[in-house]
């Protein structure tokens, strides 16, 4: 299936080079389009030309690219337009070994297949405590009954620790059971002034320490912590104290947008509003997938089918921009006039 996807990418990108009818095509583009169009026309009985000039010819070439995109992604879009019918035989065109594919396309598909079939350490973009169900007021003393050290979450990436005079204790428990981190990068600081439960202000005196695995860590410096070694706090002073521990970032096996080059840009290209026809077409295609149909996914996609669909659909969007096809989509009423931000914004409501 990798070669089928690579051929689909190659052919669509070749079509995207047809910026004008009289352009001098590169030799490899002529070879790719010549073989692909001949095979496609023979199997589907369409009339795609290598140099589309009229609207009908541009539509035919775009429909060829749409067929290839859907076939490579394994999507059966169904009846979405009175002007277009998906040709399931296109998969046979893409399976033709005579159609060459570029090194770039092959490498990109190999990257998608390779990265989605395994896991690796990645810097996570969300706060470590993002999904906590409760939070505490920053800078306000809090102590549970029968305890001398209390650690609480006070933000999506922050905890604060209240310590009685002379108290010491481990606080790594508050990190455990969250996010399955491989490494957590922390910074700790003394809270110089904090509010007691009665509302009066109190100062944290110098001498409070935070240690990892028995080694004292300097305040205000990034600490690499594996989440397993003892994270110990100690208040040797004769007054209550508070410290703040911030998770600068953490590394885990969860997939991110860095698993594929320019995945963020590909997603933006897919979900951008070009006109109402593209908006309706993209929505209809993504309705047949697990991806959201109008707005980008909340979390990075982590399976091959989703990332491959985004890559192919982003390339189809470029072809749409170049060929400027005009056809109807069921349930879509195009609005005449120039594209404005207000029109684009209204399409997502």
Swiss-Prot record:
Which segments cross the bilayer?
Answer: none
InterPro entries, per the entry: Capsid_hemagglutn, Orbi_VP7_capsid, Orbi_VP7_capsid_C, Orbi_VP7_capsid_N, Virus_capsid_a-hlx_vir
Give any GO molecular function from the UniProt entry: structural molecule activity
State the protein's purpose: The VP7 protein is one of the five proteins (with VP1, VP3, VP4, and VP6) which form the inner capsid of the virus.
* Keyword Transit peptide listed: no
Instruction: Please indicate which superkingdom the organism of origin belongs to.
Output: Viruses
Pfam families for the chain: Orbi_VP7 (PF00897)
Assembly and binders: Homotrimer that assemble in a complex of 260 capsomers on an inner scaffold composed of VP3.
The family note in this entry says: Belongs to the orbivirus VP7 family.
Protein name in UniProt: Core protein VP7
- Which keywords does this chain's UniProt record carry? Capsid protein, Glycoprotein, Outer capsid protein, Virion
Gene that encodes it: Segment-7
Q: Name one GO biological process term.
A: fusion of virus membrane with host plasma membrane
Q: Which residues are glycosylated?
A: 287
